[in-house]
Amino acid sequence: MTRLGSQGKEFPMMNLNETAARHGFCVDRVRESEELHGKMVEMHHEKTGAQLVWVDNGEVNKTFCVAFKTLPEDSTGVFHILEHSVLCGSAKYPVREPFVELMKSSMATFLNAMTFPDKTIYPVSSRNEQDFLNLAEVYLDAVFAPRILQDPNIFYQEGWHIELD
């Protein structure tokens, strides 16, 4: 089965239904979304409880985002500091600023990280499939195996400030 994308190109549709499972993710719900112009599949990971939403709408711009609930207990800005610290290298990519390297070498159409009052997100987009997969791999390694775990100085360098009287 194929679907015509927004650019008139045909895209194969993944055959997922509510009994399907892939890579430890089980499908909870499949529905058509008028707002997103396609099929939306909601899934959860059996071991970790991670939630995943996949949208099949034939869009040529592929987008991936890792998001975490980060509910602050105070106004220190610790989650914003962590957002920056996470992007200071990882186990597979131990360079000082992989985010900067990606901006120079990737074909990304969007590359960022953002902290909101209740969540922190790490979104990437690319029209090139291999570039998209590379971006997703770098971001996943950054959030699940950040260098900050071995080097706490990363947190200190990202979290300092000067107050002038």
Report each predicted region and the residues it spans.
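Acidic/histidine-enriched alpha-helical segments
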Residues: A145-D165
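M16/MPP (pitrilysin/insulinase) zinc-metallopeptidase core fold and M16-derived inactive scaffolds
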Residues: G38, D56-L135, D141, N153
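Short N-terminal helix-initiation segments at or just after the protein's N-terminus
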Residues: P12, D28-R29, K62-K69, L164-D165
